Amino acid sequence: MTEANRILLGVNIDHVATLRQARGTRYPDPLKAALDAEEAGADGITVHLREDRRHIQERDVRVLKEVLQTRMNFEMGVTEEMLAFAELIRPAHACFVPETRQELTTEGGLDVAGQEARIRAAVERLARIGCEVSLFIDAEPQQIEAAARIGAPAVELHTGRYADARTPAETARELARIRDGVEYGLSHGLIVNAGHGLHYHNVEPVAAIPGMHELNIGHAIVAHALFVGFKAAVQEMKLLMVGAASRR
């Protein structure tokens, strides 16, 4: 496989923790899921420590940081609490995401253009500990330009509107937005990733986009794992992605 056809899978294990927190038990263990995902071919593990601690807990992050063989992508709100925690655990990668307490899941991209100074300071702060920051944004030119201006090395394009599209025309339109966003991000020197709402029936067109570096996928894999097991669920997703990327 050439570099142009290579694509990475980041497995988000938040919803393993959601199941655990639903009953306040010690199981299922997100660490076990992470290790199984790595063994099955995941290129990284993504966790989101939310302000309300609805799934992943601080202890999960600390343990994962110590034992992962790949890398941890730490999703976080741009708050003093999370920045201080990131400085403590020193992840290799972090992704800044917008966050509100009432949302079921992240509902849109970060408004980088509307708060450049604040986000620039946060990116620079984590860069000082060797942490590469990506910004979770909508595939809009002004947001991509702002990400490049503030010195973020990477962006993660929000694929929720594509995933939620209800007609073939709407799906095609949203896929084109993502494709244009990847091209525009690359032209600004950014590493371009994507994620949100991707599953086994919609991932291939996104993975096939030239220049797409990594997809972060969680809920679909955790749900499928209930029926086929965690390793098999990860392997199936990776196979779909690699197959699609090979046809670029």
Curated annotation (Swiss-Prot):
<feature type="binding site">
    <location>
        <position position="55"/>
    </location>
    <ligand>
        <name>1-deoxy-D-xylulose 5-phosphate</name>
    </ligand>
</feature>
<feature type="active site" description="Proton donor">
    <location>
        <position position="196"/>
    </location>
</feature>
<feature type="site" description="Transition state stabilizer">
    <location>
        <position position="156"/>
    </location>
</feature>
<feature type="binding site">
    <location>
        <position position="12"/>
    </location>
    <ligand>
        <name>3-amino-2-oxopropyl phosphate</name>
    </ligand>
</feature>
<feature type="binding site">
    <location>
        <position position="197"/>
    </location>
    <ligand>
        <name>3-amino-2-oxopropyl phosphate</name>
    </ligand>
</feature>
<feature type="binding site">
    <location>
        <position position="105"/>
    </location>
    <ligand>
        <name>1-deoxy-D-xylulose 5-phosphate</name>
    </ligand>
</feature>
<feature type="active site" description="Proton acceptor">
    <location>
        <position position="75"/>
    </location>
</feature>
<dbReference type="InterPro" id="IPR013785">
    <property type="entry name" value="Aldolase_TIM"/>
</dbReference>
<dbReference type="GO" id="GO:0008615">
    <property type="term" value="P:pyridoxine biosynthetic process"/>
</dbReference>
<feature type="binding site">
    <location>
        <begin position="14"/>
        <end position="15"/>
    </location>
    <ligand>
        <name>1-deoxy-D-xylulose 5-phosphate</name>
    </ligand>
</feature>
<protein>
    <recommendedName>
        <fullName>Pyridoxine 5'-phosphate synthase</fullName>
        <ecNumber>2.6.99.2</ecNumber>
    </recommendedName>
</protein>
<dbReference type="Pfam" id="PF03740">
    <property type="entry name" value="PdxJ"/>
</dbReference>
<keyword id="KW-0808">Transferase</keyword>
<comment type="function">
    <text>Catalyzes the complicated ring closure reaction between the two acyclic compounds 1-deoxy-D-xylulose-5-phosphate (DXP) and 3-amino-2-oxopropyl phosphate (1-amino-acetone-3-phosphate or AAP) to form pyridoxine 5'-phosphate (PNP) and inorganic phosphate.</text>
</comment>
<feature type="binding site">
    <location>
        <begin position="218"/>
        <end position="219"/>
    </location>
    <ligand>
        <name>3-amino-2-oxopropyl phosphate</name>
    </ligand>
</feature>
<keyword id="KW-0664">Pyridoxine biosynthesis</keyword>
<comment type="pathway">
    <text>Cofactor biosynthesis; pyridoxine 5'-phosphate biosynthesis; pyridoxine 5'-phosphate from D-erythrose 4-phosphate: step 5/5.</text>
</comment>
<dbReference type="InterPro" id="IPR036130">
    <property type="entry name" value="Pyridoxine-5'_phos_synth"/>
</dbReference>
<comment type="subunit">
    <text>Homooctamer; tetramer of dimers.</text>
</comment>
<keyword id="KW-0963">Cytoplasm</keyword>
<dbReference type="InterPro" id="IPR004569">
    <property type="entry name" value="PyrdxlP_synth_PdxJ"/>
</dbReference>
<dbReference type="GO" id="GO:0033856">
    <property type="term" value="F:pyridoxine 5'-phosphate synthase activity"/>
</dbReference>
<feature type="binding site">
    <location>
        <position position="50"/>
    </location>
    <ligand>
        <name>1-deoxy-D-xylulose 5-phosphate</name>
    </ligand>
</feature>
<feature type="active site" description="Proton acceptor">
    <location>
        <position position="48"/>
    </location>
</feature>
<dbReference type="GO" id="GO:0005829">
    <property type="term" value="C:cytosol"/>
</dbReference>
<feature type="binding site">
    <location>
        <position position="23"/>
    </location>
    <ligand>
        <name>3-amino-2-oxopropyl phosphate</name>
    </ligand>
</feature>
<comment type="similarity">
    <text>Belongs to the PNP synthase family.</text>
</comment>
